[in-house]
């Protein structure tokens, strides 16, 4: 799988912080509302350097804990301006489980309820009997970014664990994409059908930046002109680093099948929402992740996708946030469950990597 910097402009900044003692920060979710750059950091009492789990001195046996912090960043330097510890002040009962806290929060905004989050949770007690399962929870925040309301998304579909739903950002009301290649849309109450199966853009939001044809053409030309050089450089790097890097064959055929939600979906055209999903395999008994950029339309149908790429050269990688400001695309991702990073690129360059999805009609 190729590195991101072989395919697109790719500048990476380490934004790792430790808002809580003896806890690592990971899986950051960046969000931009046109004025403020916010980012939720997931902070945990364990980490996975090199795919091997280590635990902090504060970790309790048989238990892992997640706390969250909201960071306001200066987008020029990516230095923190303000840090808020997000306290859990919702009134839902907790269960005695091994995983505590709201995990991998994705930030999004709607006209109806403002800034919200969607997270995975195992620690909320279910009212009915049965096994505790990971489920998605919609979070409401106050002005200090405390979690003041948590609404589990439950129903007939939740007999199996549910994680990594992709929220549509800056839309009229909450919409979530699950099963990217199938285009399954949900709201906060459950699966959508009929006329409700659509994402309506915010009536208050900014107009999306759409690169003109000249910008798109230049990006495509740069990608095509440098392909051979990139291949040569990639082979040289792969040969020289063979003892330190896993060699994974790039997925063939329908490379986009089985993608799982990573970042929010951000509007990138009149009927186009851009996101990044991930896939994973095992290499030498260790997890190996890669990412794919993709576009869906307002009904959640997959229209195009990039070929797989690695956001980080090595380690577990997990993208949870994305924001677009003009032609600037900012991606936030975690590495080895112990680092938080920002990757910056160009919208025109990203769109130039996308390939149309042609589906057969039965």
Where are these regions (language model features)?
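Beta-propeller domains
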Residues: 1-362
């Amino acid at each position: 799988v190729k590195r991101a910097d072989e395919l697109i402009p790719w500048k990476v900044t380490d934004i790792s912080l430790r808002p809580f003692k003896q806890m690592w920060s990971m899986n950051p979710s960046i969000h931009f509302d046109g004025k403020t750059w916010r980012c939720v950091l997931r902070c945990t009492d364990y980490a996975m350097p090199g795919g091997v789990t280590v635990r902090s001195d504060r970790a309790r046996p048989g238990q892992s804990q997640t706390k969250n912090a909201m960071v306001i960043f200066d987008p020029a330097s990516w230095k923190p301006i303000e840090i808020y510890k997000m306290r859990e002040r919702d009134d839902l009962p907790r269960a005695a489980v091994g995983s505590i806290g709201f995990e991998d929060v994705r930030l999004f905004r709607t006209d109806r309820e403002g800034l919200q989050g969607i997270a995975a949770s195992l620690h909320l007690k279910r009212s009915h009997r049965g096994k505790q399962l990971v489920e998605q929870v919609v979070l409401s925040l106050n002005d200090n970014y405390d979690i003041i309301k948590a609404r589990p998304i439950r129903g007939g579909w939740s007999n199996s664990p549910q994680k990594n739903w992709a929220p549509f950002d800056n839309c009229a009301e909450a919409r979530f994409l699950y099963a990217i290649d199938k285009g399954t849309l949900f709201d906060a109450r459950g699966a959508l059908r009929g006329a409700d199966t659509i994402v309506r853009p915010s009536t208050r939001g900014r107009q999306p930046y759409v690169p003109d044809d000249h910008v798109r053409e230049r990006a495509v030309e740069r990608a095509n002109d440098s392909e051979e050089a990139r291949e040569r450089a990639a082979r040289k790097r792969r040969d020289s680093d063979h003892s330190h890097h896993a060699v994974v064959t790039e997925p063939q055929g329908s490379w986009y099948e089985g993608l799982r939600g990573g970042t929010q979906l951000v509007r990138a055209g009149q009927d186009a929402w851009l996101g990044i999903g991930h896939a994973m395999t095992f290499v030498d008994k260790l997890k190996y992740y890669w990412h794919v950029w993709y576009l869906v339309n307002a009904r959640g149908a997959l229209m195009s996708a990039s070929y797989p790429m690695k956001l980080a050269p090595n380690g577990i990688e997990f993208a949870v946030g994305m924001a677009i400001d003009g032609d600037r695309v900012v991606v936030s991702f975690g590495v080895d469950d112990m680092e938080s990073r920002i990757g910056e690129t160009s919208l025109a360059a990203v769109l130039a990597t996308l390939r149309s999805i042609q589906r057969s009609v039965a």
